[in-house]
Amino acid sequence: MTVQINYKSNIPKKTATNLIVFVDEKYNTKSLKNHVSNQEYSYINDLLKTCDVKKNLLVFEISSKKKIILVSAKKDVQESDIENLGAELYTSINNGKKANFSVNTDTIISKIDNFLGHFLHGLKLKSYIFNKYKTKKVTSHITINVIGKKNKSTTYNKLKFKALEEGTFYTRDLVSEPGNVLHPDEYAKRLNSLKKNGLKINIYDDKKLKKLGMNALLGVGQGSIRGSYLVTIEWNGANNNSKPLAFVGKGVCFDTGGYSLKPAKFMEDMTYDMAGSAVVVGLMKSLAMRKAKINAVGVVGLVENMVSGNAQRPGDIVKSFSGKTIEVLNTD
């Protein structure tokens, strides 16, 4: 599913295409009057008498080719609520086919800065789908034409939301990959490719980790035929020596539990044991894309906890990077 956003300079008073307008929580239709025909206005007001106005949005079928959607937003609405409204709209208009809608920004009543940006951001986040391995892919396309005097969005805000979307989608892609594809070797390779975004990437493989004395991390992955890695991801956007924000994420690409084996039921979900690391990676990519004026570092450990003749045993003792010894009573 793709969503395309177009900002239109021409502002038609009334449009023949599918239309999205904003109203208050009481579904006061005053703001609607200047943007639809008299017939459409009367039709909607008649239907509103029997509608559930507690809903966040209402869809009115004007004809087989036109819908008018009223989106209800409180004046004191929060940014996250606005994004949820955008997500709800996407669910309403996504029918798996090509669709074209106009959003009239002149009807926005909220005082929230960049209401439109948050609304469209929520819509785009909801549009995510991971169908990389589907034999038969369902393809559809939604076009949103932004019209009205309030349709202007600064270059920074567009970049900000674009960066957030790219970072979030990258995280979701990593989490959605199956364990036989995104093992530690492949994961490390993908992280190395983030250098093109201006991030500094350092990859510590088995040999370097052993030299550093990171035996606790190595112990988790020693039963796998794949390597174990520690990856640091740096973004220096503050142009000074200020201390960086630090983010650490767990990247167990698949966790069987080792010899302390997990139950078979739902073990397939253990491919998600690397989600923490994926969040850190997506965050760092987002910071780089928006040219954030901060210093930040992300650290992720990438391992695969498997059962084999070389796997760590319950009762093994390892020495950690800090120099402390650890008795492993449970390999999970």
What are these regions (language model features)?
Residues L191, L245-F247, L261-E304:
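Alpha-helical metal-binding/catalytic segments enriched in His/Glu/Asp
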Residues L116-G122, G221-S224, K262-T271, R313-S320:
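A glycine- and small-aliphatic-rich helix-loop capping segment at beta-alpha/alpha-beta transitions
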Residues V77-I82, M270, M274, L329-D332:
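Active-site pocket-shaping loop/turn-to-helix segments
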Residues I112-L116, E186, L212-A216, G257-K265, ...:
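Short acidic, glycine/serine/threonine-rich loops at helix termini
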Residues K291-D332:
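A glycine- and small/hydrophobic-rich beta-loop-beta segment
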Residues M1-G251:
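Short amphipathic alpha-helical segment within the helicase RecA-like ATPase core
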